[in-house]
Amino acid sequence: MMVVSWQFLVLSLGIWFLVVARVGAGKDLPDSFEKCHRSDPQFDSCLRSAVNGAIQLLKDGLPEFGIMPLEPLAVDTITINQGGPSAPITLRQHFTGIKLSYLTNSTILKYRTDLKKLIIKAEAITPKIQFAGNYTMDGRILLLPITGKGKANITLHRLKSHHELIGELVERDGGEKFMYIRKYLVHFDPKLVTFDFENLFNGDAALGKTMNQVLNDNWEVVFQELRSAYEDTFGYIFRKISNQIFLKVPMNKIFPE
């Protein structure tokens, strides 16, 4: 299980929606942003292009619309409690002051919408995502005890991600219709994950170097054990963010005819 407290966390898929939500109350999108209409036969292709363009335009933020820089993204805390007595990995981890870097290098490869069923699907590729912050940790990895407190750096290389938003229509006073995201599914598929935990075993340099080597030599096993916790928790976060957007802006403004 993983618990996350966040200040500002947006994945590349949500950037375009975030812009719409921020400027939807009486403002127009900047001319530099691509607009997409449901009547366009190439609507999905337009949205894919719009998201990819917005990623670059918002790298340094958009102060006039109250949008913070997207590079890096900040997360307050993440707590992970993963595994059981018979699991190859049993860990209790707590991270603070987290910075997610290089998300703005993401590229949306596929983008599909079914607005009648209120489903949005996307696939993205990111050359590298770096997760850096302060950590405390104790537990067991592949039968080896592990403990430490210090700086951590976890990097996902050549990450392919799949996103599925499942919504339902809600109507508010005045007849305006909004899309409520009731489920957000995420799947991460990195080609490599590297770990660097400083100050393991109370600063024992030799043991720390050995444990980091074990983690990196067995990254697939380690990531596989932690994957569901990451995916479930980030899906929860992204659903919460999406609903803060979709429940503020009517569908006909997010997806104009």
Which ranges hold each PLM region?
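Cleavable N-terminal signal peptides of Sec/SRP-targeted secreted and luminal proteins
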Residues: 4-25
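C-terminal helix/juxtamembrane-tail motif
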Residues: 3-4, 28, 236-257
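Extended amphipathic ligand-handling, pore-lining, and cofactor/metal-binding catalytic surfaces
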Residues: 170, 177-234
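Short, charged/polar low-complexity linear motifs in solvent-exposed/disordered segments
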Residues: 139-140, 198, 240-242
